[in-house]
Swiss-Prot record:
Residues 24-52, 79-105, 181-258, 662-738 are annotated as: Disordered. Residues 206-222, 235-255, 681-690 have a biased composition (Polar residues). It comes from the Eukaryota. Residues 39-52, 691-707 have a biased composition (Basic and acidic residues). SMART domains: PHD, SET. This is SET domain-containing protein 3. It comes from Saccharomyces cerevisiae (strain ATCC 204508 / S288c). Residues 313-456 form the SET domain.
Length: 751
């Protein structure tokens, strides 16, 4: 038998020690049970037991040694070879490229961490107040559906069932959520915190500690242990007011809250009858409505009802779409009127009640926005023949929830009940009207089918052109943008009964066209469709034709001035000459004749003002024989400094002067140059400036000559000799005033 090595010897020593400890412990227990014995007997017995224990220990050691195989050296070599083989295999696996684990969901399934999307195994995507986020796909799930009942059970690393497939009780999760929906309860703390929540009402921030009268129960150890868990917790009641709620401290749990009372609220389906004033008969907003109805109750379109009381068909108000789990509130309740039993075409279904007023008052009220809508608002119906309307926005009956559609199945008609002797309303004490406004079926309507009435568009609304077969692109810009604005406003306050997927709805056609138009607007950030429409309208209002270059505009302006100036001057002087009396006589009084002469019609506006001023001045009447015009023979003899009456001032007369041959030649050259200028294309800027300066100098010289001639003629003697002398003087004046060019002036200096 070989000698055991150090390792084997240590194993034997440990075995003997354990055996000795167990025997000693057992012997001590037995000694405690025996009781009190003499010291001598105990000493003998202990000596025998020790001897016996040593024998047993030796026997156990020998038995243990016999179990060890003899060739220990060979086993050691074999274990060393196996260790070397495992080390080599490990190195080979490390050198080989490791395969990354494949997720069971594609990358497209992963969403943004702040998206706030809920995807749970219960197939309900609403927030129940306690959700947890997956670390891989960043989607949120109901914690209760995965068996997480409170915050303490939230794990540090969490994966949903899609990212980490495992056995989850889906039926139980659906049952829990269905029970929550059926209860329809809302905790008061969740309603208080709804304003501060983010990501569609779900706040992903860490929950705060519940406090009572300012005392804090959180500890540093709790914050360290649950730091990662708080990132995933989403209790809807993340903060509770200490005045309304209290907390109790438990030795095992750290923090627990008191049970909360559940408050039951009515849904829109059950509470619709409490948001309006129910009526039993129509209310007249104007005192003239009732006389109007009594006067026109025998019109042709009024239907004679064969009974004394109206018998209606049962209807029901219920939601046409479930908005309890929608992420955004549309701004209006989605309720409709449904029929409880079948009816055929022409049956009278239900009476419409509300406040009656004249159609004109609705149009003139700016709160109705009829200029934008172009139709009646929700719960308002226009009468098709009379200038009245029924307003059920504040009071009425269940027909106020009637929706409009492009394919209606009911219409509003007027019926007249049979006359009775005592038709008094017991509640109001007034005589009830025989005229009723009821709904009539346009076709056969089956049970549980929603009732629709037609849209009552204005006669000038652009949508009527679409109904007649025109397209939106065929409309002009003003009608197109007005139509988009009107339809967007209408759909933001209600929906058409045609549905969101109808191809025959004209409102949806306009909405789809507007959506394609909004895509063309480039916005820096998130922008509402209303703002995009305003941007389009602003661009349309500010849209102008691109202006030509400044030089081209200046040339056109100067060209127009050159062309218009001679015409305006000629017309002015011709009219001025025609408005003067021919002859050498200058009348001093009564220059304005009250008779309708042809010359007075063509007089300028200033003469009309002067005539109005002179008519207000009282002039003393004189005999017709004494009213003789004063003829001035010499202008130097006349002194006008002492004249105080404006009618006594002399008016200079422009005498016709024959043109000389040189003036005629200049006019011919003018006309030729003008024609050449018209036929030629746009000249260069330098040539144009030269022509402009020449034309301006010529027109100024011509105007100055005419004014000089007029002033000279008015002050010279009006004899034939003086006229001939004036013509000779004007011709010599023209020759003497000829301007020298720079070249001629230089030649003159050189001489």
């Amino acid at each position: 038998m070989s000698v055991p090595n150090s390792k084997e010897q240590s194993l034997l020593d440990d075995a003997s020690t354990l055996l000795l400890f167990s025997k000693g412990k057992k012997r001590a227990e037995e000694a405690s049970k025996i009781g009190s014995k003499t010291d001598t007997i105990e000493h003998d017995e202990s000596h025998e037991r020790e001897k016996k224990g040593a024998i047993e220990m030796a026997a156990a050691a020998l038995a243990t040694a016999s179990t060890v195989s003899l060739p220990l050296k060979k086993a050691t070599e074999q274990s060393a070879a196996e260790a070397a083989t495992s080390t080599a295999a490990k190195e080979e696996t490390e050198n080989q490229p490791q395969k990354q684990p494949q997720w069971p969901v594609p990358d497209s399934y992963i969403v943004d961490p702040d998206a706030g999307i809920i995807t749970c195994i219960c197939d309900l995507n609403d927030d129940d107040g306690f959700t947890i986020q997956c670390d891989h796909c960043n989607r949120w799930q109901h914690a209760i559906c995965y068996g997480i009942k409170d915050i303490g059970m939230a794990p540090d690393d969490y994966l949903c069932n899609s990212c980490d497939p495992r056995e989850v009780d889906i039926n139980l999760a659906r049952k829990i959520q269905q029970e929550r929906i059926n209860v329809k309860t809302v905790e008061p703390s969740s309603s208080n915190n709804s304003a501060s929540n983010k990501n569609n009402g779900r706040d992903r921030a860490s929950s705060t500690t519940i406090s009572d009268v300012g005392d804090s129960f959180s500890t540093d150890q709790d914050n360290t242990n649950h730091r990662d868990k708080r990132r995933k917790r989403n209790p809807s009641n993340n903060s509770i007011d200490s005045k309304n709620e209290s907390a109790s401290v438990n030795s095992s749990d750290g923090l627990t809250s008191m049970p909360k009372k559940k408050e039951h609220f009515l849904s829109a389906k059950d509470a619709y009858g409490a948001i309006y004033l129910p009526l039993k008969d129509n209310v007249f907003k104007s005192d003239l409505i009732e006389p109007f109805l009594n006067k026109h109750m025998d019109d042709n379109w009024v239907i004679q009802y064969p009974h004394k009381t109206f018998k209606s068909v049962s209807i029901e108000v219920k939601p046409y779409a479930d908005i309890a789990y929608s992420r955004t509130y549309p701004g209006f309740t989605k309720l409709g009127v449904y029929l409880k039993k079948d009816c055929i075409k022409g049956d009278f279904i239900q009476e419409i009640l509300g406040e009656l007023d004249f159609y004109k008052n609705y149009l003139t009220d700016p709160r109705n926005h009829y200029r934008i809508w172009g139709t009646a608002k929700r719960r308002v119906i226009f009468h098709s023949h009379w200038p009245i309307y029924i307003d059920a926005r504040l009071s009425g009956n269940s027909t106020r929830y009637l929706r409009r559609s492009c394919q209606p199945n009911v219409e509003l008609v007027t019926i007249k009940l049979q006359d009775t002797d005592n038709r008094n309303d017991k509640s109001s004490g007034r005589k009830s009207s025989r005229i009723k406004f009821v709904l009539r079926a346009l076709r056969d309507i089956s049970e549980d089918e929603e009732l629709y009435i037609k849209w009552q568009w204005d006669s000038k609304h652009p949508i009527l052109k679409l109904i007649k077969g025109m397209t939106i692109d065929s409309l002009d810009d003003l009608e197109r943008y007005g139509l988009i604005n009107s339809v967007e406003t209408i759909l933001s306050n209600g929906e058409c009964g045609c549905g969101n997927n109808s191809k025959d709805c004209y409102l949806l056609k306009v909405k789809r066209y507007a959506q394609s138009l909004y895509k063309s607007v480039k916005s820096r950030g998130k922008m509402n469709n209303r703002y995009k429409l305003n941007e389009i309208l602003n661009q349309y209002n500010c849209k102008k034709r691109r202006e030509p270059p400044i030089l081209h505009r200046l040339e056109e302006k100067a060209q127009n001035t050159i062309e218009r100036a001679p015409i305006l001057l000629n017309n002015f002087y011709r009219q001025k000459f025609l408005n003067r009396n021919n002859g050498p006589k200058i009348p001093q009084k009564n220059t304005i004749d009250s008779t309708n002469n042809p010359d007075d019609i063509a007089k300028p506006f200033k003469f009309a003002l002067f005539a109005q001023h002179s008519s207000n001045i009282s002039v003393p009447k004189k005999n017709e024989t004494s009213e003789k015009p004063l003829i001035i023979t010499k202008s130097t003899d006349y002194d006008e400094s002492h004249i105080t009456n404006i009618e006594e001032l002399p008016i200079p007369v422009l005498l016709p002067i024959n043109k000389t041959s040189r003036q005629t030649a200049n006019d011919v050259e003018e006309s030729q140059s003008k024609n050449e200028h018209k036929l030629s294309r746009t000249p260069s800027l330098s040539n144009f400036n030269k022509e402009l300066s020449k034309e301006a100098q010529h027109s100024q010289a011509k105007t100055k000559e005419i004014m000089t001639e007029a002033s000279v003629n008015s002050r010279r003697e009006s004899t034939p000799e003086s006229i001939m002398h004036l013509s000779d003087f004007s011709s010599s004046q023209l020759h003497s005033k000829k301007k020298l060019s720079f070249a001629d002036y230089r030649k003159k200096l050189l001489k």
